[in-house]
Amino acid sequence: MQISIIQKGLEGWRGSILVFGLLEGALESQLNALKEICTPASLAKALQDKEFVGKQGDLQSFQLIGKEPREIVLIGLGSAEKLVLDDLRKATAISCRKVIGQEGTLGILLPWDIFDSDIAAKAVGEAVILSFFKDNRFQKDPKQKKLPNKLELLGLPESSQKYLSEIVPICSGVKLARELVGAPPNSLTPSALANQAKEIANQFGLEAKILGQEECQAKNMGAFLAVSQGSDLSPKFIHLTYRAKGEIKRRIAMVGKGLTFDSGGYNLKVGASQIEMMKYDMGGSAAVIGAARAIGELAPSGVEIHFLVATCENMINGSAVHPGDIVKASNGTTIEINNTDAEGRLTLADALTYACELKPDAIVDLATLTGACVIALGEELAGLWTNSKHLSKELKESAEACGEGLWEMPLQDSYKEGLKSMLADIKNTGPRAGGSITAALFLKEFIKEDIAWAHIDIAGTCWTDKDRGINPAGATGFGVRTLVNWASRSINP
């Protein structure tokens, strides 16, 4: 989609569809701006059809016969005093769903001056592209609905144009993550995920290293390989590297959980555990690879970034790991596996150990790790655990800037008692109470004390069963935009 700024606003504008945002109250004075393109009589008639007062979510549209624009969509924004940036994203998404099926030039006019206009322009541009997303790759005869092919943001200063260049790369990363999560497990295998990572590396000049089973064995990745041994498909360890040109001010690592399918192993997923949805157990790896795609194109300065994924399936065969087995991670820690369905943390144990060996300034891992996090925070907030106040601040600011919900949770050290094993150094699960906290504490065992680390549990946020904000039903691509924002902020630690 081509995106541009039209400084003059509605003066002389003749696009195909106009989205016009209205604040609650004083509608008449705001609607005066539309006199450039339609008569007061047509406006009055449209508003008589349905009560429209400008509340958030109020929506009204009407057509102009024989004129351009051919349709005007009025969207309520609510009170100016309560309006936040994410309200613009949501209003934009609602409006975009209204115009699916139409083509041409989409113009959007909102009260930009309430916010930093540059930031608002970027937020709205992202909302348009991401709300139009539709994944129909696996249909015999996909019906491609018509969509606008041009977006014009009306009434913004020309200076905002430079920020628009970031929109398409970021949205391309999010869309890639959505496609990866949405792909069925017979399509997205560990090898297919590794091949996708290599394609990203080749396209954007990243370094790529893919380790097979023997190479992982040579690195003593006993925890990761224990999970993979029940599958007929070979595990892969993915390592992409982005290095900015010039001076490197900060080295960071992004680690994603990459279970392309999770049966639960011998602790088989049954009943309400939604085994049929366990294709999305690689949502963390999708976010990391999507971020790699966006960062590769954006090419931020001053930073070196390592993207790491240990990918495999968790299946059942004669070689599958047993409940009660003891395995050794690559840092030497022995782990009693008291639940084979707590496999993601086993793969992450070796991935985080590998990340620490790169001596980064900070590590962030993303994982669809626990149902406990979903129970605690629902489907709009991801959980954040970290050993660094500064990293916490960076990530929360990065998430807030793009409208991704992040809520910090405690690393309650006393809960580590629940991970004690009679035989090994540690168990892979603790008691049911505080399950998301003990999962984070388990991961912390594989982080060196001098490295800033954060764990983000995206179990509730990587998928939505219904349209929500800028996310159509399906995979959300959650985490990509937060990671990209964090990468750009990382040059000023």
UniProtKB/Swiss-Prot annotation:
Spell out where the chain crosses the membrane. none
Give the organism, scientific name: Prochlorococcus marinus (strain MIT 9211)
Kindly give the Gene3D superfamilies that the UniProt entry links to this protein. Answer: Leucine Aminopeptidase, subunit E, domain 1 (3.40.220.10), Zn peptidases (3.40.630.10)
Per UniProt, what is one GO molecular function of this protein? manganese ion binding
Write the record's keywords in alphabetical order, separated by commas: Aminopeptidase, Cytoplasm, Hydrolase, Manganese, Metal-binding, Protease
Which PANTHER family did the record assign? Answer: CYTOSOL AMINOPEPTIDASE, LEUCINE AMINOPEPTIDASE-RELATED
Enzyme class name: hydrolase
Which residues belong to the signal peptide in this entry? none
Task: Tell me the gene name.
Answer: pepA
What's the name of the protein?
Probable cytosol aminopeptidase
State where Mn(2+) 2 binds. Answer: 257, 262, 281, 343
Q: Active site located where?
A: 269, 345
Task: Please state where this protein is localized.
Answer: Cytoplasm
Specify which residues bind Mn(2+) 1 according to the UniProt entry for this protein.
262, 341, 343
